[in-house]
């Protein structure tokens, strides 16, 4: 009887330990497409949890939209929704993901993603560049992390597209697709940093 009780207690301890292990998951910057430069440091990682907010310069509606996109992506993966806040000039936010513009970044679609234990900064020359930085951050988060805190390694990521035109073709003239599929298709293009949706809408097989 005592042996059975010991087995039950041991199983409970193991289950509890495994459960606690699942409360934190580590992000991975090995994403597709792979950024041009990823430099990690030995500093403490940034902890992405339900207390994190996403900020953008107040008045910039495109960056606000990027922030809302990123908040939605994080909600899909973790189950919690980071609040989105606009910051006035000179304002700062602690333990936040901050979106901004940096004219010193050479490429119009380039971005720099910097991670410290205090926060994450995603800068781009344009709002498009910031969007691609958000996509890289999104892809680094485990796809299934419901209720978990995410550890994002400290360091910096610098990236810019190799090709100006990056797109995919979809022929809906010969092969019909429902509207929801097309929306999902466009989302997948954005996920992989493509910037052109080649939509083949009409055709005339009898044209000479």
Question: What are these model-predicted stretches?
Answer:
Residues 1-30:
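Bacterial Sec-dependent N-terminal signal peptides
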């Amino acid at each position: 009887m005592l042996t059975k009780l010991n087995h039950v207690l041991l199983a409970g301890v193991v289950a509890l330990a495994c459960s606690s292990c699942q409360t934190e998951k580590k992000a991975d910057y090995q994403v597709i497409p792979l950024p041009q430069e990823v430099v990690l440091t030995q500093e403490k990682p940034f902890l992405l949890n339900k207390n994190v907010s996403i900020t953008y310069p107040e008045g910039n509606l495109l960056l606000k939209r990027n922030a809302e996109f990123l908040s939605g992506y994080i909600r899909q993966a973790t189950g919690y929704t980071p609040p989105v806040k606009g910051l006035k000039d000179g304002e700062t936010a602690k333990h936040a993901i901050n979106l901004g513009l940096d004219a010193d970044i050479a490429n119009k679609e380039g971005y720099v993603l910097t991670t410290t234990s205090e926060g994450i900064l995603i800068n781009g020359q344009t709002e498009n560049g910031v969007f691609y930085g958000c996509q890289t951050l999104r892809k680094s988060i485990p796809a299934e992390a419901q209720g978990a805190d995410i550890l994002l390694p400290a360091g910096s990521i610098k990236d810019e597209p190799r090709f100006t035109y990056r797109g995919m073709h979809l022929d809906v003239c010969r092969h019909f697709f429902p509207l929801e599929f097309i929306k999902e298709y466009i989302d997948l293009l954005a996920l992989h940093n493509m910037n052109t949706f080649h939509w083949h809408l009409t055709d005339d097989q009898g044209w000479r």
